[in-house]
């Protein structure tokens, strides 16, 4: 069976002005995501250094989770690598530790690539006919994300989970006009479209369980 492994890595966290606050915010957002229904099949777990990981059997919430984490940790940045493939060990439903297989290898390889490239997003394990398109889309998106303010991440997250503009504005305590301005300036509807398309492709691969071994 194919799974989707997410590894996140805080960038330059050791140089953060308030590292303890950053760690506390990371723990809080991961705890919140682990309490969501549906949960990851193996929960968000802090691992070595400033990394964390989780395992999914559906891509439905993966990208909005990533955006929510970025919003919570801003201005500190996070690189995310997704690995699609099999897990050759028994799945651990208690914590994302002690597992192995192609999905983990691809996700780990992606983190190494991101450290070299300076990008924020990587996806490995897609069939060849989708891989280059996904890589290009995520690299373009990475360049946008590095220039965003916290509110833009929060607005994108609201759009991804289907919140109306009025609700997003109330949560952020800004005007609806400011929300619409962010949507337009950041091309957020286009970003939402790209992430929705990638979610569909990933779910097709997870369901087929064919080209991801």
Task: Describe the function of each predicted region.
Residues 1-213:
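Regulatory and interdomain segments flanking nucleotide-handling catalytic cores
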């Amino acid at each position: 069976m194919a799974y989707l492994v997410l590894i996140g890595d805080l960038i330059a966290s050791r140089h953060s002005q308030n590292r303890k606050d950053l760690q506390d915010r990371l723990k809080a957002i991961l705890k919140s995501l682990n309490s969501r229904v549906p949960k990851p099949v193996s929960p968000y777990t802090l691992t070595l250094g400033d990394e964390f990981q989780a395992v999914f059997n559906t891509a439905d919430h993966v990208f909005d989770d990533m955006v929510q984490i970025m919003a919570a940790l801003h201005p500190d940045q996070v690189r995310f690598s997704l690995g699609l493939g099999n897990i050759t060990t028994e799945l651990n439903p208690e914590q994302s530790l002690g597992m192995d297989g192609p999905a983990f290898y691809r996700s780990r390889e992606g983190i190494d690539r991101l450290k070299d490239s300076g990008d924020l997003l990587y996806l490995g394990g897609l069939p060849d006919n989708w891989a280059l398109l996904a890589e290009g889309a995520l690299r373009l998106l990475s360049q946008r994300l590095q220039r965003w303010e916290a509110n833009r991440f929060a607005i994108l997250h609201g759009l991804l989970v289907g919140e109306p503009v009025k609700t997003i504005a109330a949560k952020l305590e800004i005007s609806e006009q400011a929300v619409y301005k962010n949507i337009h300036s950041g091309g957020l509807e286009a970003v939402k479209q790209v992430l929705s398309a990638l979610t569909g492709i990933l779910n097709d691969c997870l369901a087929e369980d064919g080209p991801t071994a």
